[in-house]
Amino acid sequence: MAKETFSIEFAGRTLTVETGQVAKQANGAVVVRYGDTTVLTAATMGKMATGDFFPLQVNYEEKMYAAGKFPGGFNKREARPSTDATLTARLIDRPIRPMFAEGFRNEVQVINTVLSYDENASGRVAAMFGSSLALAISDIPFDGPIAGVEVAYIDGKYVINPTVAEKESSSLELSVAGNINAINMVESGAKELSEEVMLGALLAGHNAVKELIEFQNEIVAKVGKEKAEVELLHVDEDLKAEVIAAYNSDLQKAVQVEEKLAREAATKAVKEAIISVYSAKYENDENLSIILRDLAEILEGMEHAEVRRLITEDKIRPDGRKIDEIRPLDAEIDFTPRSITHGTGLFTRGQTQALSTLTLAPMNEAQIIDGLNDEYKKRFMHHYNFPQYSVGETGRYGAPGRREIGHGALGERALEQVLPSLEEFPYAIRLVAEVLESNGSSSQASICAGTLALMAGGVPIKAPVAGIAMGLISDGTNYTVLTDIQGLEDHFGDMDFKVAGTREGITALQMDIKISGITPEILAEALAQAKTARFQILDVIEATIAQPREELAPSAPKIDTIMIPVDKIKVVIGKGGEQIDKIIAETGVKIDIDDEGLCSIFSSDQSAIDRAKEIIAELVREAKVGEVYEAKVVRIESFGAFVNLFGKQDAMVHISEMAWARTAKVEDVMKLGDVVKVKIMKIDDKGRVDASMRALVEKPEGYVEPERKPRERRDNKDRRNGNGFDRRNNDRNNHNNHNNNSGNHSFELRERKSHVDHEFPELSTKKPE
């Protein structure tokens, strides 16, 4: 195949697709260039798998060379995918998966490799486009194409594929994907936006998606391959009719058992009895394994059909609830002692239960994220764990999988919208959700438990957040939207639409579907039902704890902050860390200073924090013109006196400024050690301060200012002491993570120009010129 190139302008950037040049042994491969982002996508198909699921694998490979960076770590090589790469792979998988035929069981692998990265041209948008197109032009049976975009909401307007700067000013971060007819994937974080604004964003995003799909269709028409004939998994129709006729009523009764474990036991017993009958019947048949495989599919289909029939026809759910009814709710705080943990929340919804535990720490414990974007510190972490005992099973127990990472990220987006700013609450925050029981919607239970833990721990969140999962049963013509879906409804339903938010608005959305798409009408109905349910859950949360506690747990570290001018960082640190060492030794605190001048002080002793803050405030204090001080005389010269205003800040009082009458000698007015009242008259561009005593005394009536020769300061030798030195230590080594371990200072030294500008040395004996 010869190289083909296709281009359009999309959302302010050029989108270029190249085919036929690279990865030609894959079933389908494309190079997508969006802005300066380049993604290679290759799609391949393997043999038919033996399992009862579609083995689709989507990878998003972040190569550090794409951003001109070296990988971290000892080996200097990319290892396991980052959290962001894992989430992006899930984001692509979810809209693609429903576009394969029922019964398709061949292995399909889609690999997206980021070759160059432009932060203002989304790699995930390019990779989603490339994944769909690689499948669409290949011979792999794929009922696409699909596409996805990002949507921001800025000053009342929707922006498609926003730049980094636009994202920073946006109140919405939305990824939406779909086919030409409908939306089939949503992922969003939002700053308490209304249902109407969110629905508008979804529709704006889908309109943009249609443009990308039309572009793909043009490419497929020119370079697409004929689709391969692939065997789909079909069951024996005669066997299916026989089993339904004989056993459907038994399975219907089992499905209608309301309690989860009892229902599972009942359906399992019915299925095992049927399998036993047919195992004996076809014991000597060489196709026994195929018969039993078909039988398992038939029984699953019978259960699937009965659950959907109950909901759509009888308007009864398997557990007996109404269509819009929430399961029984319970909320509790302080599940573990506050003397040990910093805050806990236990949230139960029916047979789904999550325990969330809060941990607070200084910002030096924040997670450092180093990916294709610039390195940054991640202050808030929400981790989700799903042990197998939560569903009464045994299984793998180890590092979190893609599902756990995804559910944790959803909770993180929902809760981070209401967190206080770093200036308001200078802590790194970690929430860990342990799912203790699960019968559907455990990710939303973790959000509710997280809200309880934050409030119990004294984190001043703006408002409590609750989450609910909405479901859908649709036959293509009629549909039913379900509130608070349980596991069975999730498994056999068509949609899992998670909505989290406060009373003011939505903070997070996530939608996965098993059908080709969802109409705007269904989305609007689901959002409206979710709002009603969310308020009911918030009632329970607020009845448990109405407001965040005013005090942190006794076990939580105490932190206070003070903003210091960037040019004063050197003063607080001192030469070689001498000054900050002195503060630490005196108070016993730990101190962290960032490049912006945010100085965090932490200790278990509040009085120690207060003392350290007082010392630092004094060190960075600056004199201002017009201020009045009680100042101590620290040096006397023939032309005037030097007085100490505070800390290491001195001022010079010229002899002519000591009184309105002529002063012959400084000693006639003051002596060393005297305390005099002075007013700041001038501060020059080098920070030298002139003060006056006479300015605080009323000018005598009839006073005439004598003529004086203008006084000029010399750049190289100041009149005061013959040099340009500052008494204050001006080392500007930036200090981070400084602790009071004996002699062990952990701080980062950045190259700064060394200043030795000591002004007014107290012990100088050099006479002025």
UniProtKB/Swiss-Prot annotation:
Principal location: cytoplasm
Chain residue ranges for the region called Disordered: 700-769
Entries under SUPFAM superfamilies matching the protein: Eukaryotic type KH-domain (KH-domain type I) (SSF54791), Nucleic acid-binding proteins (SSF50249), Polynucleotide phosphorylase/guanosine pentaphosphate synthase (PNPase/GPSI), domain 3 (SSF46915), Ribonuclease PH domain 2-like (SSF55666), Ribosomal protein S5 domain 2-like (SSF54211)
Domain KH: 557-616
GO biological-process terms attached to the record: mRNA catabolic process; RNA processing
Gene Ontology cellular component annotations, sorted alphabetically: cytosol
Pfam short name (any one): S1
E.C. numbers: 2.7.7.8
HAMAP family in UniProt: PNPase
The protein's name in its UniProt record: Polyribonucleotide nucleotidyltransferase
Biological source species: Lactococcus lactis subsp. cremoris (strain SK11)
